[in-house]
């Protein structure tokens, strides 16, 4: 992973990179936590201002919480987000002061559900939110319907 970070910095130029998004991270074992710490320290060693986003797509442990600036702690369909949300396990996620470090991604949402999802994200301490009505297998390949209306709802 460090080589990959270096390749990006070399190719794009360190002044053109503001951070890194690490997908599919895990935090179940000490080895996984230590690996994320190593990556986090390496990226921050390149520039303290680099943003580190880690995406486990699920609740995190307190052990890993220091090793990213933002964690994607929920990446699910609107149905799951509304009806079967996996509650946080860590004190980190439950602490309101950490909302700025928590990001929820909700796909397959009907635009009529946007307001409800926004309300739930606030109740669930997510300071960052992405909603799309796009669906699997790649729900991130187009702009969400009613995007401007959604942004206005979020900014209320």
What are the language-model segments listed below?
Residues 1-156:
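Glycan-processing catalytic domains of CAZymes
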């Amino acid at each position: 992973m460090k080589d990959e970070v270096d390749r990006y910095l070399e190719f794009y130029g360190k002044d053109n990179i503001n951070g890194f998004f690490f997908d599919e991270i895990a935090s179940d074992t000490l080895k996984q936590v230590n690996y994320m710490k190593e990556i986090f320290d390496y990226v921050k060693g390149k520039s303290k201002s680099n943003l580190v986003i880690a995406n486990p797509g699920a609740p995190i442990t307190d052990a890993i919480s220091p090793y990213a600036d933002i964690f994607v702690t929920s990446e699910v369909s609107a149905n799951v987000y509304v009806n079967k949300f996996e509650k946080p396990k860590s004190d980190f996620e439950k602490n309101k002061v950490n909302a700025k470090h928590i990001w929820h991604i909700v796909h397959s949402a009907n635009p009529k559900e946007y307001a409800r999802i926004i309300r739930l994200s606030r109740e669930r301490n997510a300071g960052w939110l992405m909603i799309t009505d796009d669906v699997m297998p790649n729900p991130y390949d187009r702009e969400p319907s009613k995007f401007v209306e959604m942004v206005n709802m979020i900014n209320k």
